[in-house]
Amino acid sequence: RDIVLAMAASTTSGINNSRFINADYAPTADFDLLLKAALYAKEKGINIKAGNVLSSDEFYEDDPDFYKLWAKFGVLCVEMEAAGLYTIAAKFNVKALAILTISDSLVTGQKSNSIERETTFQDMIDIALNIA
């Protein structure tokens, strides 16, 4: 399973646009946590990707090709929490890093079953526990 370290989080949500009075806010990870996670993964031989992710209000979009525009701009995956996590972390001046394991692929259509979801996320957990 691919592991993604979310450097930043774009969003389809309007919450930050509302919060920042019609302006765009770019929520980002804490650099120290990101660096520690990347270095730990490299040391342990865990393959990771680091980059921008998309926080979407809808996990299952009506348009199966909606991700293609985001992918063209280098967005690595779609999830639902990173933009909110990073925005609140910035508001309260705390560190945050979203570490994600790809469970379902919009590109290939591959989906994890419930047993895989329970048993194949160990590398992500290992990274998180060792950088905290």
Name every feature range the model reports, one short phrase each.
Residues 1-132:
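Glycine-rich phosphate- or other oxyanion-binding loops that anchor nucleotides, phosphorylated ligands
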